[in-house]
Amino acid sequence: MKKIGTELLKRGFAKMVKHGVVMDVTNPEQARIAEDAGAAAVMALERVPADIRAEGGVSRMSDPEMILEIKDEVSIPVMAKARIGHFVEAQALESLGIDMVDESEVLTPADEIHHIDKNAFDIPFVCGARNLGEALRRIDEGAAMIRTKGEAGTGDVIEAVKHMRAVNEGIAKVVGYYEMGCDRELVQMARNELKVPMDLVYEVAELKRLPVVNFAAGGIATPADAALMMQLGCDGVFVGSGIFKSGNPEERARAIVEATYNYDKPDVIAEVSKNLGEAMVGINVDAIPEKELLAKRGI
C-alpha cells in the first residue's frame, strides 16, 4: 500500500538533485573531490562498475562502515546500492541514515522475478529502466527517481541514449493516444505493453513526461556525453567509472558538472572539454557477450 505523504516527500528529495550530477565514489577522498567539484550527491560503493565488470564474481551491498565514512566526509546527499530484490540490504542501508537507495542492476540480482517493494520504505529509491514500461513498473513499486540503465562500466554512452530515446518514444505514444481520445488503445497499452495501472498511464499522458525525475546513467564519460543526455530530456546524470577511471578526475568532475548545467551552450561544452587528460579507455558495448550485459537484469 502506498503512503501518499511519504511518496510526496521521497519524490521531493529526488527533485532536489535535479539538474545535478551524482558521482560514484569508493572512499572519503573521492567523495571530497566530488563535493568540491559541485556534485549534487555521491553514490558510495566499494568498486566502480568498471571494476565490478572486470573482476567478476558476486557483487553485493558495500561495507556499511565504508558508507558511513563517506557520509561523515561530505555535506551533500549520499546514496548506496542494493541488489535487485534484496529488501534486507535496502533495510540495512536505510538504517544507516543515507539519503537514497539505488536498486541496481550493477550488483548481482538477488531475485530474478521480484523487485523490492519500495512503497514499504521511508527512504527514496532510484531504479534503472530501458523503456517506458520498465520505468512505470518501478514507479508503481515506489521508485522516486528513474535513471537509464545504459551499460555501466563501459564508458560507451550508446545504451543510455537508446534507453532515453525509448522512454521518450513511449511517452509520445501515450500522449498521442490520450490527445486523440483513444482510450481503448491506452487501456490495451497499459495492460499488454506497459503492464501498469491506468492511473499511472493517465498521469504520464497529462504531464507529458514521467511523474518522477529521470536521470541518465551508464557509459557517461565526457562533458559532451552529459550534455547529450540532458538535451535528450534527462533531468540530471549519474557518472560512475567515467571520473575516477580518467586521467584527471578533479578537472573531469568539474567539467561534467559544468556541462550538465550548461548543456545547451556548445561554447561552454567546448571550453570545459579542453585539457582534461585521457578519458577512461572503456569497452565498446558491441564487444560484450550478451550474457554479460548488465542492463538486461531486472525488467
From Swiss-Prot:
Residues annotated as binding D-ribose 5-phosphate: 24, 153, 219, 240-241
Entry annotated with the keyword Lyase: yes
Involved pathway(s): Cofactor biosynthesis; pyridoxal 5'-phosphate biosynthesis
Reactions listed under catalytic activity: aldehydo-D-ribose 5-phosphate + D-glyceraldehyde 3-phosphate + L-glutamine = pyridoxal 5'-phosphate + L-glutamate + phosphate + 3 H2O + H(+)
EC number(s) recorded for this UniProt protein: 4.3.3.6
CDD domains given in the database record: pdxS (cd04727)
Pfam families, alphabetized: SOR_SNZ
Keywords: Lyase, Pyridoxal phosphate, Schiff base
Record-listed D-glyceraldehyde 3-phosphate binding positions: 165
GO molecular function terms noted in the UniProt entry: pyridoxal 5'-phosphate synthase (glutamine hydrolysing) activity
PROSITE patterns on file: PDXS_SNZ_1, PDXS_SNZ_2
PANTHER family: PYRIDOXAL 5'-PHOSPHATE SYNTHASE SUBUNIT SNZ1-RELATED (PTHR31829:SF0)
Function in brief: Catalyzes the formation of pyridoxal 5'-phosphate from ribose 5-phosphate (RBP), glyceraldehyde 3-phosphate (G3P) and ammonia. The ammonia is provided by the PdxT subunit. Can also use ribulose 5-phosphate and dihydroxyacetone phosphate as substrates, resulting from enzyme-catalyzed isomerization of RBP and G3P, respectively.
Assembly with partners or alone: In the presence of PdxT, forms a dodecamer of heterodimers.
Protein name, entry field: Pyridoxal 5'-phosphate synthase subunit PdxS
Protein encoded by which gene: pdxS
